[in-house]
Structure formats: structure tokens, C-alpha cells
Regions:
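Structural recognition of the conserved hydrophobic beta-strand(s) that form the central parallel beta-sheet
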Residues: 162-166
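Short regulatory helix/loop adjacent to the ATP-binding pocket of P-loop NTPases
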Residues: 153-154, 170-181
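Conserved D-loop-proximal element of ABC-family nucleotide-binding domains
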Residues: 145-147, 174
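Short glycine-rich substrate-engagement loop in P-loop NTPases that contacts/grips substrate
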Residues: 61-63, 103-134
Length: 181
């Protein structure tokens, strides 16, 4: 099921797929508490739960569809779209903290097909050996070429990874149709 949320506060749109049939699974990454002392202040102060997340209450407030999808671990591949600083990366991090899933963050500017293949191989192992799903957060996903975008399609179609794209550009224009669908 594909949902689109207009974000009036940041003039962006959050596109996401929601699996309504999945039961609630929650957990916390044991290593997320040990933040690097040398990380940027914004990363150290970043909200870790939906209750700490400020703003966007029309989509992540109590009882709202996106919040329910995150809390029940039924959020599928998604694209977060909006201007810098509106909470796209923070919301993706909250998804990682709220669900019991593995979370891998890549930047489209510095990552290539080889990096994606490594993530997919590790995700496939996690799924087969431990039954643990993997989210791939790709910052600035609009900067990926068609070849790079096509490299994750088989893994998405087979359910090996869940994709969260973060972009400041309209994904309907800047990304390949196969990824957006």
C-alpha cells in the first residue's frame, strides 16, 4: 500500500509504503547509546524516538498513519522529500531505533554500486541467518545515476532490503521510476 503525506511545514512530501498485515515488532539497537564523542553536535543531539521528534505532528503525531507504521514495524521502502533541516534524516534514524532492524546509512555522493552490493550481501545474510531486516538509508538519493539506482532494484523486489531515500529534490522528477514505484 503506497501512501503520500504532504508536509505543509517544510513544503515537502513523504512517500512511503505501508504493510498493514505485519504484526508489531520493536526493539532498540544496543549500540545506538554509545554515540561517538567526536560526532557533530547535531548528530549527538538528534532525537531518538518519535516522542522526542519536534514538528511534523500531522504525519508522526500520536495515532497518525506514519507513526503507526513505524511503531508496528510495517513501514516499507520510503522516500522522504523536503528542504534541508526539516527532519528527513532524523526520521529515518528514528525508524532504525524504533524497529528491530539493521540500519545502514550511505550518501549517494560518496557511495557507488560496490558499496550497495556489500550492503545487500550483508542484508541477505542478516535476513537468512537471524531473520532481521535491513533498512538502507540513502542521503541525497536524487544524485544517484540510473545504473546506481538499478543496482538495488532486485534486492527491493525480493524483500532483502527496505529503502529509505532522503532528498531535497522532487523524487518524481529526479529519481528513476522503478525506485519511486
Amino acid at each position: 500500500f503506497f501512501e503520500s503525506f504532504n508536509c505543509a511545514a517544510c513544503h515537502g512530501i513523504i512517500y512511503c509504503k505501508v504493510n498493514y498485515s505485519k504484526g508489531k515488532v520493536s526493539g532498540m539497537d544496543l549500540f545506538s547509546a554509545g554515540m561517538n564523542k567526536h560526532a557533530p553536535l547535531a548528530d549527538r543531539m538528534r532525537p531518538r524516538t518519535l516522542d522526542e521528534f519536534v514538528g511534523q505532528q500531522h504525519i508522526v503525531g500520536k495515532g497518525k498513519l506514519l507513526r503507526r507504521a513505524i511503531e508496528t514495524d510495517s513501514l516499507q521502502s520510503s522516500i522522504f522529500f523536503g528542504p534541508p533541516g526539516c527532519g528527513k534524516t532524523t526520521l529515518a534514524s528514528i525508524v532504525a531505533n524504533t524497529t528491530g532492524s539493521e540500519f545502514v546509512k550511505l550518501n549517494a555522493v560518496t557511495s557507488g554500486v560496490k558499496d550497495v552490493r556489500e550492503v545487500i550481501a550483508a542484508a541477505e545474510d542478516n535476513l537468512k541467518l537471524y531473520g532481521r531486516e535491513t533498512y538502507l538509508l540513502l542521503d541525497e538519493c536524487h544524485r544517484w545515476s540510473k545504473a546506481q539506482s538499478d543496482s538495488i532494484l532486485p534486492a527491493l523486489e525480493r524483500g532483502i532490503i527496505k529503502f529509505i531515500g532522503s532528498t531535497t529534490e522532487n523524487p518524481m522528477v529526479s529519481m528513476t521510476g522503478a525506485i519511486v514505484s
